[in-house]
Amino acid sequence: MTNRLSESSTPPRWGMVVDVNRCVGCQTCTVACKHWNDTQPGVQWRSVIDVETGRYPNVERFFLVVGCQHCAVPPCVPVCPTGATQQRDDGLVTMNYDSCIGCAACAVACPYDARTIAHEHQWYYGTETLQEESARHPEREGVAQKCTFCVDKVDEATSRQLDPGVDFDVMPACAASCISNAISFGDFNNPTSNVSTLVHDQPTIRLNEDLGTDPQIKYLYSTPTVPGRDADADDLDEKHQSDPTNPLVGKRQNFWDWRATMNWCLGGLGSGLAVSAWIAYVIGQISMQATHQLQLIAGVMMLAGLFFVWLKLGRRWRAWRALWRPQTSWMSRELYAAGVFLISVLVTTQISQPVVGLYHLAGFAATCFLLCQARILHSAKGIPAWRTPRVPWLIVVSGLFEGVGLTLLLVSTNVVSNDGTFYLDPSKLAGVMVTLAVLNMILWLGYRYGADRAARPPLANRIVDNMSWPLLIVGHLAPVLLALAAWFHAADTSALLATAGFLVIAGGTFWKCGLILKASYQHGFTLSRLPQRGSGTRAAPSLVA
């Protein structure tokens, strides 16, 4: 046995080295992982993807071991609203299943598709067996789960003063079982460890290095006789990146469905209404009573959006735990903002004398809520269409645009009575409508054609392109024309403004649903260099010669 403490640094930095040229794609590591961790059908903590490209005889094939990368800068940790996803001092990113609520914030933040949420237990043969029942982990159902580098083995190694990179009985299951010695585990902080020696002597690559996550699985891709190569135009062309059969191309996320989307549709609309009403009140365009009426309606919509999110949670009765991490999680901050807003509105309802400060507090809280929604989506580092710089601006401006649209709809249809203090004249409302429509159009066109386009995968760009014309015509141009018609129309403009408001809301709902449900392709796997394991022009230079 090896004394780990005598050789490694303190604290260690555990990681893996995978030799792509050694991996034969036998899947022994995936089976060993499933056996040791007792994962149910459909749950893969460790996977081996088969990458085959080209056309005969110029073909190339290699195998890539993937899973949680235990990043030094893990994007999954700060987004977790409960603190269930944690990073230890030794670098391991672990899960506390008892704290997780199954919100999937970590899953969409992970750019390596490493997390799974199994809402119901599945059996390998369709019915329960004694062995599966004895190995069942009910604490993992409805919550996020992923590779832990067999943390139980690592901790056992520490307690027994062994080296999990050398001693097989405490080595992670995938590394211990690899038949070709392609997977090595060890301490990157120890310069004499097996993994440090491997990466010191040979060139390595890491998955999705451009994202700045500093993943701790490093891949050897080159040997003296079979040198690696740079990714070429064929690897990066749009056709290759749009091929759904390409295992390196990200699949559409299924963690956040229509229920989660309703939070952005209803919550964004409600908070936009509250912020718009607050601004109008501050500049003297609507009365205190009218402001309160609109805030009540906004509160109902925000609550409805949060209710749909609650329905999406894997562990709904733990939802209160989402208040635990306001220091890092925008989801936690969103709940606090909603709480402040709702309490302010309810207190205003109960007191006999209006308190101006409560109206301002509610308006400020609604603004924070809208900003939190923008940042929640932007923090999803695993979804390129969400993490681009214009997305937060789109969420905020669209929320205000929809809020003005809803105000027009409510007033024009007499849902909220117009006592003459809602606005000075129709021309001002039309001006606000046109201004926000133009600003939103500029942001959307920038999102579609600007630098954001290059940051999105081609499959997501197709969705964005298909959404653009309906969105611009129905959600922007038509409301602008109706608002301008109301501007110049001397007679009753209620029908024009109500229709314009409805179209604005419809447009906002359309693009949010499209962005969250349709354009939400995961990042996939990006390799800056690749091994040359092929034939014809794809063969290594030394073999061609």
Per-region residue spans from a language model:
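Membrane-interfacial loop-to-helix junctions in multi-pass inner-membrane proteins
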Residues: 88-101, 166-170, 288-297, 328-336, ...
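Long, contiguous internal "core" modules enriched in hydrophobic/ aromatic residues
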Residues: 254-258, 262-269, 281-288, 328-329, ...
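Membrane helical hairpin/interfacial module
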Residues: 276-279, 283-337, 344
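Non-ligating segments of multi-cofactor redox enzymes
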Residues: 1-257, 265, 276-282, 300
